[in-house]
Swiss-Prot record:
PANTHER family: RIBULOSE BISPHOSPHATE CARBOXYLASE (PTHR42704), RIBULOSE BISPHOSPHATE CARBOXYLASE LARGE CHAIN (PTHR42704:SF15)
Protein name according to UniProt: Ribulose bisphosphate carboxylase large chain
GO molecular function, one term: magnesium ion binding
Sorted UniProt keywords: Acetylation, Calvin cycle, Carbon dioxide fixation, Chloroplast, Disulfide bond, Lyase, Magnesium, Metal-binding, Methylation, Monooxygenase, Oxidoreductase, Photorespiration, Photosynthesis, Plastid
Residues bound to Mg(2+): 201, 203-204
Residues binding substrate: 123, 173, 177, 295, 327, 379
Cofactor: binding comment: Binds 1 Mg(2+) ion per subunit.
Keyword Oxidoreductase: yes
Quaternary organization: Heterohexadecamer of 8 large chains and 8 small chains; disulfide-linked. The disulfide link is formed within the large subunit homodimers.
Length: 475
């Protein structure tokens, strides 16, 4: 009799409640290459042993429930159950543990981040026996990775489409984020693209509000980028936000963007949802559109150290679901992001293989086989003085995005774009000449500002601006 149809009728059914650890805590278990592995930060309630807490997580996120049920005998729990196979205390924290759980691959629908998360980060996060629970990392087996399309195009295809190599790409989020008419919005897009930026971006809040309906915005932005392309000889793009209240409206906007011939659209993947995101990603692959991803709502999920989901997990999920860019924090700007932790998940986005490295928060080695990489986008409170650090931290395969750091230039939008392009070109040239950007960054910017009045003005206006607060996200 096959494991799927094997029953336990000959053993007999014993009703009642038993400890989770009797079934789901298996320290002797040797993980399989096909298992999905999870590292949970578990904070048990007082009096709950860590073995019981870890087993409860494994049970409630796989086959278990609070009591023994008769229908357990109609399947093979050993085949399908999650297993807590290792527990270690968290250094410096009282009554907090990292519990490692292995899930058989058969528990999950192929190609569905939605289904994977519904199990692994579902009802178990409200379990009363736990004070708090955080998913720190996932190991996605190659067998499961290959069931996903992944990013529509990836880093190399994007560079080939844009014909831009050897430097980070430059972007700008149009501000104010809400309230502009479509024509004035398009004017700002044109001015900064003409000034030297590669991309402009809809703010994540911009969908189709009364002050600016989506179709009007798409038309004026397309006109702006084509005009800027004609004048500069460079390929330009604007992230047209296709996020909508329904998947049907989202796809209608993506189709219209394709008909306009623009190179890239955008989606808010957490508020929009993984099913919608994967659908849009497949459309973008089939129709030659790049896909920019914003992570609005991520801090609600990932910022608390002891509860939620770490962003490295959300980043892995995005690489599976599909996106060519994703916002990743800046390390040096106004938004949360500690350097080693940030670079840990940046590598998870870009590289084919990432080694386990607990100093960077990476709990498992991860292979992406042939899945394309995702460009990290550094955005939020950055300006020209940050350019050396951003270039050194993120390297060439990144998008450096300056909203207020472009449009806040005292001489206007186009000079703000010029200042950023000059600063970037100076940093890339200095790096290629062997100069140390971390040590000589300010000197490099000052030298460049001597022959660029736009950069000099930007340096003066933002010379005192710093965002220095301790990071919440630490190992």
């Amino acid at each position: 009799m096959s494991p799927q149809t094997e029953t336990k009728a000959n053993v007999g059914f014993k009703a009642g409640v038993k400890d989770y650890k009797l079934t789901y805590y298996t320290p002797e278990y040797e993980t399989l290459d096909t298992d999905i592995l999870a590292a949970f930060r578990v904070s048990p309630q007082p009096g709950v042993p860590p073995e019981e807490a870890g087993a409860a997580v494994a049970a409630e996120s796989s086959t278990g429930t609070w009591t023994t049920v008769w229908t357990d005998g109609l399947t093979s729990l050993d085949r399908y159950k999650g297993r807590c196979y290792h527990i270690e205390p968290v250094a410096g924290e009282e009554n907090q543990y990292i519990c490692y759980v292995a899930y058989p691959l058969d528990l999950f629908e192929e190609g569905s981040v939605t289904n994977m998360f519904t199990s692994i980060v579902g009802n178990v996060f409200g379990f009363k026996a736990l004070r708090a629970l955080r998913l720190e990392d996932l190991r996605i087996p190659v067998a499961y990775v290959k069931t996903f399309q992944g990013p529509p195009h990836g880093i190399q295809v994007e560079r080939d489409k844009l014909n831009k190599y050897g430097r980070p790409l430059l972007g700008c989020t149009i501000k104010p984020k809400l309230g502009l008419s479509a024509k004035n919005y398009g004017r700002a897009v044109y001015e900064v693209l003409r000034g030297g930026l590669d991309f402009t971006k809809d703010d994540e809040n911009v969908n189709s509000q009364p002050f600016m309906r989506w179709r009007d915005r798409f038309l004026f932005c397309a006109e702006a980028l084509y005009k800027a392309q004609a004048e500069t000889g460079e390929i330009k793009g604007h992230y047209l936000n296709a996020t909508a209240g329904t998947c049907e409206d989202m796809m209608k906007r993506a189709v219209f963007a394709r008909e306009l011939g623009v190179p890239i659209v955008m989606h808010d993947y957490l508020t929009g949802g993984f099913t919608a995101n994967t659908t849009l990603s497949h459309y973008c692959r089939d129709n030659g559109l790049l896909l920019h991803i914003h992570r609005a709502m991520h801090a609600v999920i990932d910022r608390q150290k002891n509860h939620g989901i770490h962003f490295r997990v959300l980043a892995k999920a995005l690489r599976l679901s599909g996106g060519d860019h994703i916002h990743s924090g800046t390390v040096v700007g106004k938004l949360e992001g500690e350097r080693d932790i940030t670079l840990g998940f940046v590598d998870l986005l870009r590289d084919d293989y990432t080694e386990k490295d607990r100093s960077r928060g990476i709990y498992f080695s991860q292979s992406w086989v042939s899945t394309p990489g995702v460009l990290p986008v550094a955005s939020g409170g950055i300006h020209v003085w940050h350019m050396p650090a951003l270039t050194e931290i993120f390297g060439d395969d990144s998008v450096l995005q300056f909203g207020g750091g472009t449009l806040g230039h005292p001489w206007g939008n186009a000079p703000g774009a010029v200042a950023n392009r000059v600063a970037l070109e100076a940093c890339v040239q200095a790096r290629n000449e062997g100069r140390d950007l971390a040590r000589e960054g300010n000197t490099i910017i000052r030298e460049a500002s001597k022959w660029s009045p736009e950069l000099a003005a930007a340096c003066e206006i933002w010379k005192e601006i710093k965002f220095e607060f301790p990071a919440m996200d630490t190992v």
